From Swiss-Prot:
Pfam families: Antimicrobial_2, FSAP_sig_propep
Propeptide cleavage-removed residue intervals: 23-41
Record keywords, A-Z: Amphibian defense peptide, Antimicrobial, Cleavage on pair of basic residues, Disulfide bond, Secreted, Signal
Family per record: Belongs to the frog skin active peptide (FSAP) family. Brevinin subfamily.
General function of this protein: Antimicrobial peptide.
Chief location of this protein within or outside the cell: secreted
Cysteine pairs bridged by disulfides in the record: 67-73
Subcellular location field: Secreted
Protein name, as recorded: Pelophylaxin-1
One Gene Ontology term, aspect cellular component: extracellular region
Tissue specificity comment: Expressed by the skin glands.
C-alpha cells in the first residue's frame, strides 16, 4: 500500500511539473510575439512523452488496484 501511495504521489508531482512548464511556455509565447523555437518544440515533445508515461503508469496502478479489490486477476 505504501509503494502505491509513493507511485501516485510521483505521478501527481510529475503532472504538476508538466502543468507549470506549460504555463511558463504560454507566458513566454506572449513575450516573444508567439514565435515557436526549436527548443520549445523539443520541450513539447518531452512534455508529451512524460504525459504518456504518466498515463501508462496510472493505468497499470489502477489495474493492480482493481485486481486487489476484486481479489482475482
Amino acid at each position: 500500500m505504501f509503494t502505491m501511495k509513493k507511485s501516485l504521489l510521483l505521478v501527481f508531482f510529475l503532472g504538476t511539473i508538466a502543468l507549470s512548464l506549460c504555463e511558463e511556455e504560454r507566458g513566454a509565447d506572449d513575450d516573444n510575439g508567439g514565435e515557436i523555437t526549436d527548443e520549445e518544440i523539443k520541450r513539447g515533445i518531452l512534455t508529451d512523452t512524460l504525459k504518456g508515461a504518466a498515463k501508462n503508469v496510472a493505468g497499470v496502478l489502477l489495474d493492480k488496484l482493481k485486481c486487489k479489490i476484486t481479489g482475482g486477476c
